[in-house]
Amino acid sequence: MIGHNNFIIQSVILRFFMFQSVEGLLTPGLIKQQKEQLKQTELENFAQADVNSLISHRTLFCDNFLIRLWRQFSLHEVTDLALIAVGGYGRREIFPLSDLDFLILTEQPMPADLAKKVEEFIQFVWDCGFDVGASVRTLEDCDSQGRADITIATNLLESRLLTGNETLFDKLSSIVGREDFWPRKTFFEAKIQEKKQRYQRYNNTSYNLEPDIKYNPGGLRDLHLIYWIALRHSNALSLEEILQSGFIYPEEYAELERNQQFLFKVRFALHLILKRYDNRLLFDRQVKVSELLGYQGEGNQGVETMMKAFFQSLQAISLASDILAKHYKEHFVDENGEEECQVLDDNFQMINNAIFLVREDCFVQQPDTILDLFSYLIIRPQAELHSSTLRLLHLALGQLNGYLSELPAAREKFLRLLTQPRGIERALIPMHKYGVLTAYIPEWKGIEGLMQFDLFHIYTVDEHTMRVLAKLETFLSEETAEAHPLCVKLFPSLPDRALIYIAALFHDIAKGRGGNHADLGAVDVGRFAAQHGFDCREIETMKWLVKQHLFMSVTAQRRDIHDPEVVMNFAAEVQNQVRLNYLVCLTVADICATNTTLWNSWKRSLFASLYQYTNQQFNQGMDNLLDNQEQEEQNKALALEILQSQGFTEDVQSLWKRCPGDYFLRNTPKELAWHAVLLAGVETELLVKISNRFSAGGTEVFIYCKDRPNLFLKVVAAIGNKKLSIHDAQIITSLDGYAFDSFIVTELDGSLLKFDRRRVLEKAIINSLNSNELTKLQGSENHKLQHFNVKTEVRFLNTEKTTHTEMELFTLDKAGLLADVSLVFSELNLSIQNAKITTIGEKAQDFFILTNAKGEALSERERQSLSEKLQARLD
């Protein structure tokens, strides 16, 4: 099949791309037509085609086009000119949207008429629809500019003569081949610095969910780094030549070749579906590319399977690039001074600052010694791994007959790593990077490179898991106390940190299998813990942590934590203080490692409040619900202290007598004091104030007015029209019918509102509330969201309360969502008593406390009607 397909492509080349069938002059229209025919042929035969052939044919097309055009402009008659492919074009890597990089080389500066003709030649190439990277230089220019700029130097190193003066090209080759043009050490260090800067732009991880095929860590640029180092050192021009030079092992060559082919195929497919040059695999493109590559499955299965293979390729290339660069540095760059050698044990030595494996067969003959390697990394904080050690480790992992965890000695060493200071940073994270976790934990391979096709999880499952572990370890440092005071207080005193580390390792390990990943992961961690000799109580703790790792997050963010019944139910599941301490640390680390924008002081206070209430419930006992009266009085007293410190002398009791008990629970003492100052002697029926001082995780909007129909709808529409995100809504009605409502809002990027934006929003809300008409929402959809299919789901929580109904709404987040929801509530004469607004990537997961027109809980018929109307409106 492949041979037949390549024959088709070759036939097209003979007819079109050699330009033998084209009579007369080339025109931009003709070239564009032939480019389109080539693209169509590639699309029709892409699934079965060999990507190397596709790239070669593209390169050949460009070669013959430029050579013929060179003659058409009579530039072949000029003896002092050479047309040279450089950069990616020079190494024959042309994809459908690649830049066409070429150099027009001359020995001496051109006369004006020739310069004009060359300029017209370059413009013609642009007119044909190519993105052109053209330069016109003399030999002297190439020498001086190449020495000054590493990018120019690298391009020149990859030069390939297309047509023109061969002697001139040879002179260029001599210039760039001189040792003093870019000395090997200087060239290597410059390229490594480029790589470091590139990695920093991508958070030092291969696992960005909308990756750049070229520049992402592990992308094509990491392959190019290997090429460039080998090219500067030995003039090797391809992986095959690098293999022949002895720079890489046959096993390394096979792995690099396989992963290069995969990235080439993905990039070629991406270029076929785009109109403009780009190498980013954005979500919408991932779907199309996976289809073009033939990936199939229900829902997102096809795209997730492709992206898993993609991320595994990135990780393999990144690792190979690191190892080979380290190998080159150790052997060819570092000064040839005396090596400092220190014996660590029979198997390991320290050579300078690198851990060196003495016996090459050690890892194969005694696999448990692999764990010793990481123990030495902990003991010696400044040490790194020698390139030969890494290469032997990589080869040994491929020869294991079973999992390392099957070896008693390895299990003992693994558990010891978890108890060491910086054991996560210096052992577990490197073990993941170098493939040892995959060799240790049977289930780990299933999540390696596994992405979730959504906007919420910005890392793959394995990368997220390592970030959870890393975050947990930071709770041992006082430097983390400002952002995580509760966790820094609790984590050092946990009975056994190994339990939470292992629970973190397994909390998402069953993702991608179908079914409830928390339940399946609990089974996995139970088996692993039993294998490692933990007792029944410890095993049950780990199983519970994995099974319930989302429980605190859901309760804090999607339940009314000021409701004593909610606190009682949460405490009943947690059971005791030790579990609570474990759970809060795991939950916070999980949130922080999921998405860097999720954690803020508002959420910190939310989780701290739930922790505090649960503590109170444990201390009081589980026989009775919490009485919130004590907390209400404490908040009042603290608010009075704040007011007195500010010199506030007005009587607040008359104001507070109007407010229900919930008002003093749901607002902090600072907010209570702020409201008292705002409302002192207020005569207006409507007050809107916005401040950044009371919720560091967002901007607080406080609204005081006589309660009125559609109040919530008008407010959220006004906020939505200003392109803001709503994170929390607190609806409180005073005993005399006034709204004391608060909203937490941010800009779309999560930042606080600046002064001008706050004033504009105040006016917009006042105008909306004073208007007799409902505010029309103006806005544009987030185009990223259209690629996600989220069906609306309405859930009513099972409570025995007759005073209100609690409802959860799951739907696609979109512009004006809350306004649409509020409109449905309004149509059914429902009142919102409270709301929690949570956006999880592309999904809205909102919680509402509602009453009907009678001020009671919704009947079954009212629930059914509400559910149907919401689904009809939102889907």
From Swiss-Prot:
Record-annotated disulphide pairs: none
Uridylyltransferase: annotated segments: 1-343
Uridylyl-removing as annotated region, ranges: 344-699
GO molecular function: [protein-PII] uridylyltransferase activity; phosphoric diester hydrolase activity
UniProt note on regulation of activity: Uridylyltransferase (UTase) activity is inhibited by glutamine, while glutamine activates uridylyl-removing (UR) activity.
Keywords, comma-separated and alphabetical: Hydrolase, Magnesium, Multifunctional enzyme, Nitrogen fixation, Nucleotidyltransferase, Repeat, Transferase
Cofactor(s) named in the record: Mg(2+)
Domain notes: Has four distinct domains: an N-terminal nucleotidyltransferase (NT) domain responsible for UTase activity, a central HD domain that encodes UR activity, and two C-terminal ACT domains that seem to have a role in glutamine sensing.
Name under which the protein is recorded: Bifunctional uridylyltransferase/uridylyl-removing enzyme
